C-alpha cells in the first residue's frame, strides 16, 4: 500500500491509502492530462479546418458583362432606384411637383423669348407645345446624365464595403429619371387636348423613342460616372457640356431652321430623337435617316461606355 496525499478544494491536505496499482493509474492519468494540455497550448488552431479563400473581383474583359449577375441583383437595382427618387425630393415643399414645374417654367420662358420676341418658325405647330415636346425628352436625358455622372462618387460608402455590379448605380439614376418623365408627360397630354392635337398611328413610335433616350442616357451617364471617379473635374465640366448640347439640339427651334448645318446636326443623337418625338406627337413624317443615325450613334456610345466602365471598374474602390 502507498500513501497518497492530495489537496482538497478548501486547501487542506487529504490522505488516502491506495494500492500500488492504483497509484500507477493516477500517475499515468495525470501525465496524460498534462501532455494533452501542453499539446493544446502549443497548437491552439490545429482542430480548425482550412477554408478556401474566395476573391470577388470584376471580370477582366468587357465582353463578360455577366447579365446573369445583373439579373441576380435586380432587387438591389429596384432599391437604388427608389432611393434616388426619394432622396431627390426629400425635405422639399413641393415634392414631385418639381418634375412638372421645371419643364413648364422653361416652356413659358422659351415661348416668350423665342416664340414671341424672336419669332422662330415651328412648322405650323403652336410654340408652347412645340417647345414642351422638345423639352420633355431633353430634360429626361440631361437630368439622367447629370445624376448618373455623380452617382458613383455619391455611393462611395457602398462601393468600398459591399460587392455588387457597379453598373447598377448609374443605371438606377437613369431609371429614377423615368419616373419624372412619366409625371411630366401628363402635362403634355393636357397641352395636346388644349390645342386639339389629333391622335395618329405615329404615337406607336413613342416607346421606341423613349427606349432610345434611355439607352443614350445610360451610355453617356455610365461613361461620365466612371471618369468622375478618377477625374473629379468631370463634375465641373459636365454642366457646361450639357449646356452646349442643349443649344446644338433642335429644342427651341426645328431642325429645318438650320438647313446649312443638317449634315452636322444629324450626327447629334438627340436631334433625331427630339424630331422623332414631335413627329410621333403631331403626326408628321419621320426622318428615318436621322433616326437611323441616332440609333447607330447610341449603339456605339453604349458599347464604348460599357468597355470603359469595365476597364476602370477594378480600381473604383481604391480611388473613390
Residue ranges and their predicted role:
Residues 2-320:
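Hydrophobic transmembrane alpha-helices and immediately adjacent juxtamembrane helices
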